[in-house]
Amino acid sequence: MRDGGDGSTEGTRRPTARLKAKSTAAAGGGLGALLKDWRALRGMSQLRLALEAEVSPRHLAFIESGRAVPSQDMVLRLADALMLGLRERNVLLVAAGHAPRFGEGAWNSEELKELRRAASMMLAAHEPYPALVLDAASTVLDANTGALTMMGEGRDALGRINLMDLVFSPGRVRSAIGNWSEVAGFLLHRLRENARLRGPRSEAARVLERVLAFPEARHLPPMPGGAGSVLVPLTFTVDGVTTHWFTTVTTFGAPLHALAEEITIEQFHPR
């Protein structure tokens, strides 16, 4: 063996160097594939992403090929340029060998208790009119009595039922919606947008795939509305009584938690 000049031998240095190179490639390889996928989804070239993230095209090429492992700050800059949500940013961070930056606890977790309290107050204050809490995939996480009555569900169903399933599957809700095509078309458009934002691995994308299996979903207009339209109305008939509604949507400001970013509180107002 030849001396390496620093007290070590070439024979002992080379395996370490090879191991380090393999670790670097492994850490960057998964990230590189994710970045390429997101660029394709956003219709961005490597050059455009480099310009948006203010990084040299050469360095970005090294990151995507696994020849360089980016810092946490660099990953977040790339995520900003790709307009990713907090959950998707965590995925990139982990792929680059960093710890997740943003919380991902469930709706009933301790870390979200203040958000649940705020949402619960809003739902209660909106009684007797319907109001519900949805995630990005349209899962109903919470609802007031007015909404549960409209859906024909009990509180034990919260967290398990999905608004898209209720609207598209044959049953009480679908049969009660007088302008079903208009409402379903809008909800499908909204779900598509969430799936596009969250990516093909998201729960929103899985729900979208399930909804698109309904034959009627293929024939809905890409986006309802027309001249003179302000909001998509909802006409709902139960036991011969017809009611007319429009909705408002509330989100949490300045979220630093993935689910907090995705939550919407939807309130129904009589017309």
Which residues does each predicted region cover?
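Recognition helix of helix-turn-helix/homeodomain-like DNA-binding domains
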Residues: E54-V69, A79
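Alpha-helical residues within the helix-turn-helix
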Residues: A40, L51, D80
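Conserved hydrophobic/aromatic packing and binding residues within compact polymer-binding modules
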Residues: L35, L49-A50, L60-I63
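PAS-family sensory domains
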Residues: E127-R218, P224-A227, V238
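Amphipathic alpha-helical interface segments
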Residues: N194, R198-G199, R210-R271
